[in-house]
């Protein structure tokens, strides 16, 4: 398996880039966020990768961080979701946003991603919802979970929401959300349509 690659960008396409290392150019498919952060042709790049082996092809998929790669691995583990579909889903938002959609059971938003219909979106939620939790949502971000958000999560769980639903509601809070527990609770309940 090729777990990572470091090299020089030779070309950038709509859904791939070519990275040359050791005199070999590797075609690597990547989500939009990775492509937009890649830099210009001729610049150095480091990607976390997954090599998918099929009977007729060896295909590399590259990611800017481990959170994207981990989510990609979870997505391709879902029945009916292949690498291209998982890449399309990762291109629709950050790993936290995608996890929030799954944890919150937001089938409508998932189904709006190109290539994902309602049935596939439902299958993704069904198979991954219990595997996405608050710790995973928080761990993939660069900031730690505040004591306020931990308390908010406990309140939401005591109101009958699952830990995954609470995590999705908290992850959906805007970055400039008020620092008071009451206001954050109001915004979190609005996420569920309860406020």
Swiss-Prot record:
Cellular localization per UniProt: Cytoplasm
Keyword DNA-binding found: yes
Family statement: Belongs to the RuvA family.
Region described as Flexible linker: spans on this chain: 139-143
Segments for region (Domain II): 65-139
Annotated region described as Domain I, given as residue ranges: 1-64
Gene giving rise to this polypeptide: ruvA
Domains: entry comment: Has three domains with a flexible linker between the domains II and III and assumes an 'L' shape. Domain III is highly mobile and contacts RuvB.
Cross-referenced InterPro entries: DNA_helicase_Holl-junc_RuvA_I, Hlx-hairpin-Hlx_DNA-bd_motif, NA-bd_OB-fold, RuvA, RuvA_2-like, RuvA_C, RuvA_C_sf
Pfam families per UniProt: HHH_5 (PF14520), RuvA_C (PF07499), RuvA_N (PF01330)
Keyword Nucleotide-binding among record annotations: no
Coiled coil ranges: none
Entry GO CC: cytoplasm; Holliday junction helicase complex; Holliday junction resolvase complex
Name this polypeptide is given: Holliday junction branch migration complex subunit RuvA
GO MF term (any one): four-way junction helicase activity
UniProt region (Domain III), positions on chain: 144-195
Purpose: The RuvA-RuvB-RuvC complex processes Holliday junction (HJ) DNA during genetic recombination and DNA repair, while the RuvA-RuvB complex plays an important role in the rescue of blocked DNA replication forks via replication fork reversal (RFR). RuvA specifically binds to HJ cruciform DNA, conferring on it an open structure. The RuvB hexamer acts as an ATP-dependent pump, pulling dsDNA into and through the RuvAB complex. HJ branch migration allows RuvC to scan DNA until it finds its consensus sequence, where it cleaves and resolves the cruciform DNA.
Keywords, sorted A to Z: Cytoplasm, DNA damage, DNA recombination, DNA repair, DNA-binding
GO biological process: DNA recombination; DNA repair
Subunit architecture: Homotetramer. Forms an RuvA(8)-RuvB(12)-Holliday junction (HJ) complex. HJ DNA is sandwiched between 2 RuvA tetramers; dsDNA enters through RuvA and exits via RuvB. An RuvB hexamer assembles on each DNA strand where it exits the tetramer. Each RuvB hexamer is contacted by two RuvA subunits (via domain III) on 2 adjacent RuvB subunits; this complex drives branch migration. In the full resolvosome a probable DNA-RuvA(4)-RuvB(12)-RuvC(2) complex forms which resolves the HJ.
Domain of life of the organism encoding this protein: Bacteria
């Amino acid at each position: 398996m090729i777990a990572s690659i470091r090299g020089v960008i030779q070309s950038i396409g709509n859904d791939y880039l070519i990275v040359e290392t050791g005199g070999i150019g590797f075609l690597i498919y990547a989500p939009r966020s990775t492509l937009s952060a890649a830099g210009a042709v001729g610049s150095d790049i480091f990607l976390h990768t997954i090599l998918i082996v099929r009977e007729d092809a060896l295909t590399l998929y590259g990611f800017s961080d481990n959170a994207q790669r981990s989510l990609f691995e979870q997505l391709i583990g879902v029945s009916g979701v292949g690498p291209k579909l998982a890449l399309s889903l990762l291109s629709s938002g950050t790993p936290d946003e995608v996890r929030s959609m799954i944890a919150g059971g937001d089938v409508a938003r998932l189904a709006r991603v190109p290539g994902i219909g309602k049935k596939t979106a439902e299958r993704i939620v069904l198979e991954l919802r219990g595997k996405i939790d608050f710790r995973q949502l928080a761990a993939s971000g660069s900031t730690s979970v505040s004591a306020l958000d931990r308390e908010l999560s406990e309140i939401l769980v005591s109101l009958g929401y699952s830990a995954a639903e609470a995590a999705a509601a908290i992850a959906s809070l805007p970055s400039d959300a008020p620092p008071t527990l009451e206001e954050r609770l109001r915004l979190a309940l609005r996420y569920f349509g309860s406020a």
